[in-house]
């Protein structure tokens, strides 16, 4: 049964000694039988054993060449043949003793399996000296070979447990036979039991030493080995080994080996090997059946021997794997391919993943994870740490990154029932960088930072208990809750204090304080926002109410002739109230506007000289022919502005009859005002100034004085400030006023004043509404006139749409060379149109603003309208005053500017309105104003007559007025 040479080579490797091989030659047939039977018993592949037997036979046939062949074929062993070698060697060499020895070694090696390292050195020490010089030499070679081949070559190809066992069995049998023959004289039968035993232990270590043995043992069924180990260990005692040991001095090495084995937990195996050796010698002498019976015993002994060998080999392999993983040498791992990598643990209970992670070998960790499976990532060592936890403890960020982001270890970011989360470990071990990365990752994944462990400790608690301030700061930066209490009722600051970490405790106290303050700030800010929103809504509601009241005032059926009509007065006073409410907010704007009116009355004169020049040129053109009328209209405008606002609001609702009555009234008033335009303008300015004084008393009073004393331009400024439309400077405000006044205009002013306004309208554009306030007829004609100013004064007066267009464009276009009287007449005609155009009032307002530059005549009409429509003025003064307040801002000096800027932006209008409201608030009642206006008209008729000419001059020459 000759096996291939590679098998022979394997066999040769096992039979290190030539003499041993020779002995095996003699016993080859029996050995072959035994090997076959043993192979069957051992569940080792019979084919392998048969091959081994044949090769063994051939090898013994080459007694002298065996050593050479062995040495020659070591490289071959290094190649795959080792797998087959164990089988051939066992079968070829002494069948009986081989089998016995093989089994014996199986038992020993299986026990030794965990101690392969120990076995190898032991083999080197005591292996062959007992056998003889040749065997010892062979053993030396084997030792060398065992160290190199077993650790390096055999491991990759042969499973240490299976192959090593059969190999050791074969070698042990061969060596036992060889030793028996050598020592006892080729015949194992003659050898005493002791000698056999001694030789056997020697051989056993030798067999253990041979790498081929270990692979054979590996090949041998591990179960049988284990059984043999158990039985032999139990049955065989150390004394048997002792017998084996002392039997031979040559075996002193073997004794040493045995002693080593004894010292090792595999001493039992060695002991087993000793009695096995005895049995083996007997069996060698006895029949194959006896040998077979010995096989189980020998096998057990062998198993012990193999157990020791296998253990040593296994331990060697494990240690080598652990070393490789420790060093992160991934390239060496495939050569150590083991079926049970996941069962390899070090003394601390760390599996390979623990080791790789703790050492920071990310690539090795990934490779091992692919080999072992991710389930191993959940294993915990003696410290109850997973590979991820151990990596955190050792600060291996890359490994933590990979495990958390790519494997199931992400589950460890959350606390489990029994174990804390990874950030707990990071805080516990003070790993700030890892903690930072974990927090970032958790933030991205939406994982809570405040999870607690079994004791209710959050990561902040753990970090504070261990005094890692940096970790605490990192956690705080990422929003960890520092006020949480654990199950003991401690906050992190208290835990830090209790553990003596005062710095951390202080920091946490500061953070708690800041957090509480911040929360309060947030609450206050939220409340402030809510209140601000409410305030804004209230303001908007107030504005809506004011607008509604204004529109109601415009649409109020109460005629301006009935100034005391409760609806109009109520609406006015409501507007005033709302204005007052808003004035709280807009007081600043109103006061500023009034102050501006005061200062602007002077400064605007200088500033608006250019504008006034332009507007004055227009006024000159418009007023040049009818300056007296213009003066009257200005006066009327100043009075009518308020009246027109009130009346314009009510005029829409006012029946046509009332409007006609008002128109007739206004015509009379206009006639009066024409005669008394100067005095009316002064008077109207004065009474209006008085309310203006109420609005802004300090400035209005000097303004009033200046109005009376100053040129009609100054009086117009005062008028404007006093809600008089006389001054074109009011026009930006007056436009608004005039718009509302246009709405009210139907009754207030006479046509004459309106034409004046219209004539002024081109320049003032805003006065027409003021005139309408005096008389609806006038206001409408004024607005229409202003509109005409844009297009043609007559056509504008005739068509409300043209009025609207002109009112917008008339500011600069207002150049009515036509007599103002005609304008006023057209205004009377257009009063009805203005009533229609009251909705168009905003457009007219620009015209009225322009007209306001003219309002000298309008002031007359205003005075008249005040006398006739004082009630209306009272009702509508709030609006008119709002507008007039803006008008005073635009004093005569501003008339030109306003004439240019008659299309005052609604914002400025709003401001003007606010100012007017404030002035209205301060104004006692329009009745008082009207009385003042009447008084002024009476007392100042002469002055105004004088000033009419003066106003006419100013209207013709606005600069001189300033």
UniProtKB/Swiss-Prot annotation:
GO-annotated molecular function: identical protein binding; ubiquitin protein ligase binding
Stored Pfam families: Ank_2, SNCAIP_SNCA_bd
Keyword Repeat: yes
Extent of Polar residues compositional bias: 772-790
ANK repeat feature ranges: 348-379, 383-412, 418-447, 455-484, 602-631, 698-728
Protein name stated in the entry: Synphilin-1
Residue runs in coiled coils: 522-548
Gene3D superfamilies found in the cross-reference section: 6.10.250.750, Ankyrin repeat-containing domain
Subunit: Associates with SNCA, RNF19A and PRKN.
PTM (free text): Ubiquitinated; mediated by SIAH1 or RNF19A and leading to its subsequent proteasomal degradation.
Source species: Mus musculus (Mouse)
GO CC, any one term: cytoplasm
Region annotation (Disordered) ranges: 80-99, 104-137, 222-249, 548-590, 667-852
Record-level GO BP terms: dopamine metabolic process; regulation of inclusion body assembly; regulation of neurotransmitter secretion
SUPFAM superfamilies in alphabetical order: Ankyrin repeat
Entry keywords, A to Z: ANK repeat, Coiled coil, Repeat, Ubl conjugation
N-terminal signal peptide: none
